[in-house]
Amino acid sequence: DGEKYEIIANYFILSAGAANSAALLLKSKSEKFPHGLANSSGLVGKNWMVHNATFMVGFNPFRRNKTKFQKTLMLNDWYWDSPQGIPLGNIQMLGKLQAAMFKGARPWAPNWALKFLAEHSFDIYLESEDLPSQENKVTVDEDGVIRIHWKANNMKSHNQLVKSARRMLHRVGFPIVLKETMGIETNSHMCGTLVAGNDPRKSVLDSYCKA
């Protein structure tokens, strides 16, 4: 509204998520803090991570899925299954997908087909770690618009997990396996933009998450 307010306190807690917390600090530039509060390292907004994620659906037209407990299974069986010793990630139930959810991903598909698919599918979520990179970051334009700059990394291990999960679904009786590897739009797990550490030259926060 254009008015300035002054709030005095011993402590302030900034807890606005990985994107907005970084954006608030980047917007706080002043003569005293030319790069924004807590940004003497220049790392505010950098090292944005979000997880590598794939939605996978096993489909069998002759087996109806009547589950009532939609989020009861999680597997780490392939976590250390890489010959290179690289963590592959985690598999968990996605929850029971419904026709309207499939419609969002495949708007051209007829509703009756999506309903049949939803009633005869087993749905899992594959999650692997992405790695911190200063090229993956949150920035704020001069006009105040928040931008996310992101390029997927560590996909080799994630793709190995996808192959293992696909084989598993085939073995347990799903002749058709569909998958969708998610991109930046699946960002509910974002983190990393205010990195903590013991060296203020290489971190934004200390080991107690204080700036």
Model-derived features: where do they sit?
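N-terminal start-of-chain detector that recognizes signal peptides
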Residues: 19, 28-31, 95-99, 110-113, ...
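FAD cofactor-binding and catalytic pocket of flavoenzymes
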Residues: 41-155, 159, 190, 202-205, ...
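Glycine-/small-residue-rich beta-strand-loop submotif within the FAD-binding core of flavoenzymes
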Residues: 1-2, 196
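Short, functionally important structural connectors and interaction interfaces within domains
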Residues: 36, 40, 132, 186-188, ...
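Generic structural signal for hydrophobic core residues of well-folded globular domains
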Residues: 28, 128-130, 172
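A glycine-rich dinucleotide-binding beta-alpha-beta segment and adjacent secondary-structure elements
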Residues: 153-211
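Short low-complexity stretches enriched in small and charged residues
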Residues: 12-15, 104-108, 170-178
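Glycine-rich loop(s) and the adjacent beta-strand/alpha-helix scaffold that form part
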Residues: 2-68
